[in-house]
């Protein structure tokens, strides 16, 4: 029986664990946290239909109180002079789910299908023979061997970060690759009537990042996010500002009240080695514009499990696993790379530049509602007259779209077979399309 070791109970790893255990693989998930502590104490948006497909549970069978509809949305410019409102109908309303019941559903699904779990066990490093991964070593000195290690241990995964250089997997984290966030749900002291209860701030208080204030039925959800680390003084400063603008925000934290680090860059071009496959945050599987990555991670778990099932009689070499790497980039990664170009172009502008784009309708509701999905070169050229009121800012966004589109085209056409030299040259072309954050 082929042995599968999943490092970390991330979304992608749990999906793969369930699929593989059901198909006769010997699957062990090693997770450093207690089972009951897994999952952020906040909500996220993703495709509920995909979760139903994975778990076999309809939305009516999801845990009671685990999800809700989110209200209408408004994006505010850095100066707060311009507000772009987005109104939803019965068919377009956004659904959000608490992360803890989501993780519980995925764990229960994997357990039901035969996967085994080892909680409260910290992984220290991979066990390697040359460039091949053979298992993991835990912090207490135990060694676990497997035919493949699925790395679902997050952006700072001790498996990935300690891989030998011969794997050629990129471990560098650059400024702008991560989003540092603090999020809490506060009690409400009043019940205001709001057209757009979910307010999103780009360059909030003129700092590179994104924040929001979402007034829910019983709580006020506040996110403070930046591309650079911040501490308690910044949180207090920002909460004072939010309470001034939203005086119904109370002092009591009902949920959350903690930091999170979210990858916001294009996926790794190379995420496999002999006996190793990265998935989820360890491979930067998120949408750069908004940090949403649950859908990408769930799909990655399905793709990886399919490749392993199809090749169950083979050694899980980089050449075999490249099929997973390639399929994910084609099916999921191409748009993420385009999205990064737009995100980095926006974050490289001074706040006055973002104000200009808002106030001259270069950025509109249709662009923001899809996290940049609806903004392309053709639509941007339709805003040429307004944009040319300040060519420097306008062409910075045009350049971001052009470079992002070029990267997306390359992501959609990775080398057909695993050949490191070809992969290196292809990856370097993609790196040449990257927009660097100033």
PLM segments and residue spans:
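Conserved Rossmann-like nucleotide-cofactor binding loop
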Residues: 12, 35, 156
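Beta1/beta-strand and adjacent pyrophosphate-binding region of the FAD-binding site
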Residues: 1-12
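C-terminal helical "tail/cap" subdomain of flavin- and related membrane-associated enzymes
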Residues: 309-438
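Glycine-rich FAD pyrophosphate-binding loop
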Residues: 7-9, 21-41
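N-terminal FAD cofactor-binding segment of flavoenzymes
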Residues: 33-76
């Amino acid at each position: 029986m082929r042995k599968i070791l999943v490092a970390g109970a991330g979304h992608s790893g749990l999906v793969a664990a369930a699929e593989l255990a059901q198909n006769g693989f010997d699957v062990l998930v090693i997770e450093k946290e207690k089972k009951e502590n897994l999952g952020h104490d906040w909500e996220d948006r993703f495709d509920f239909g995909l979760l139903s497909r994975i778990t076999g549970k309809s939305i009516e069978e999801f845990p009671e109180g685990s999800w809700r509809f989110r209200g209408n949305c408004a994006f505010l410019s850095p100066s707060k002079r311009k507000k772009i409102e987005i109104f939803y109908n019965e068919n377009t309303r956004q659904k959000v789910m608490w992360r803890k019941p989501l993780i519980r559903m995925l764990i229960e699904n994997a357990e039901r299908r035969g996967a085994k779990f080892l909680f409260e066990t910290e992984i220290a490093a991979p066990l390697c023979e040359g460039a091949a991964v053979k298992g993991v070593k835990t912090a207490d000195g135990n060694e676990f061997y497997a035919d493949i290690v699925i790395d679902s241990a997050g952006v700072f995964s001790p498996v990935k970060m300690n891989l030998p250089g011969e794997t050629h997997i990129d471990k560098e984290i650059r400024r702008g690759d991560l989003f540092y966030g603090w999020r809490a749900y506060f009690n409400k002291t009043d019940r205001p009537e709001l057209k757009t209860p979910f307010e999103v701030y780009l360059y909030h208080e003129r700092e590179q990042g994104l924040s929001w204030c979402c007034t829910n039925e019983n709580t006020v959800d506040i996110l403070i996010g930046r591309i650079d680390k911040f501490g308690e003084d910044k949180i207090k400063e920002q909460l004072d500002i939010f309470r001034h603008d939203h005086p119904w925000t109370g002092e009591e934290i009902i949920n959350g009240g903690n930091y999170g680090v979210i990858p916001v860059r294009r996926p790794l071009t190379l995420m496999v080695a002999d006996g190793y496959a990265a998935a989820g945050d360890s491979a930067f599987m998120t949408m750069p514009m908004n940090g949403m990555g649950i859908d990408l991670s769930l799909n990655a778990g399905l793709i990886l499990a399919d490749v392993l099932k199809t090749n169950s009689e083979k050694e899980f070499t980089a050449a075999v696993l490249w099929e997973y790497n390639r399929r994910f980039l084609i099916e999921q990664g191409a748009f993420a790379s385009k999205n990064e170009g737009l995100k980095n172009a926006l974050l490289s502008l001074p706040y006055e530049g973002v104000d200009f784009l808002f106030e001259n309708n270069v950025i509109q509701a249709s662009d923001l509602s899809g996290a940049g999905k609806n903004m392309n070169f053709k639509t941007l050229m339709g805003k040429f007259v307004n944009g040319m009121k300040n060519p420097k800012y306008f062409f910075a966004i045009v350049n971001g779209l052009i470079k992002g589109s070029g990267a997306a085209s390359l992501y959609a056409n990775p080398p057909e077979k695993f050949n490191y030299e070809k992969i290196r040259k292809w990856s370097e072309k993609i790196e040449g399309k990257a927009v660097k954050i100033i």
